[in-house]
Amino acid sequence: MQLTELIETTVTGLGYELVDLERTGRGMLCIYIDQLAGISLEDCEKVTRQLQHVLTVENIDYERLEVSSPGLDRPLKKLADFERFAGSEVSVTLKKPLDGRKTYRGILHAPNGETIGLEFEGKKGEAAMLDFTLADIDKARLIPQVDFRSRK
């Protein structure tokens, strides 16, 4: 079983979603998890303990394991991510330029089949629509929406 598959099986078995996995050159393994209710420190501890056990049993070499939430600027990688965050502000970078540009920022529309829509501000300030597929994307992230005024 490959590392990604092993980790995804473990994480989903605990009731979480594997958002991303990074392995650095210094033996660090970074795992990003999420769930609809959000991620707490206890969730990260639970997944860390289980992964430490699984990685030891499977004899996977690593120096340090880090489990965390994907953060406010969470990456969007799967079609389910685009469905879940429809209506949110996102930044999308395409692999190839479209109309002379690769990076777009706008409001995500729910996917229609394999096609994902992004409403953005066009060249003359008017609303424009970009349609793309997962295969067109280099990277996509949520734009954090933070409101400090609501805190007392």
Curated annotation (Swiss-Prot):
Gene3D superfamilies on file: Ribosome maturation factor RimP, C-terminal domain, RimP-like superfamily, N-terminal
GO biological process terms, semicolon-separated: ribosomal small subunit assembly; translation
Species whose genome carries this gene: Burkholderia ambifaria (strain MC40-6)
Localization per Swiss-Prot or TrEMBL: Cytoplasm
Name of the molecule in the record: Ribosome maturation factor RimP
Biological role: Required for maturation of 30S ribosomal subunits.
Gene symbol of the encoding locus: rimP
First-listed, main subcellular location of the protein, grouped into a coarse class: cytoplasm
PANTHER family per the UniProt record, alphabetical: RIBOSOME MATURATION FACTOR RIMP (PTHR33867:SF1)
GO cellular component terms attached to this protein's record: cytosol
Family classification: Belongs to the RimP family.
Lineage summary: Bacteria, Pseudomonadati, Pseudomonadota, Betaproteobacteria, Burkholderiales
Keywords assigned: Cytoplasm, Ribosome biogenesis
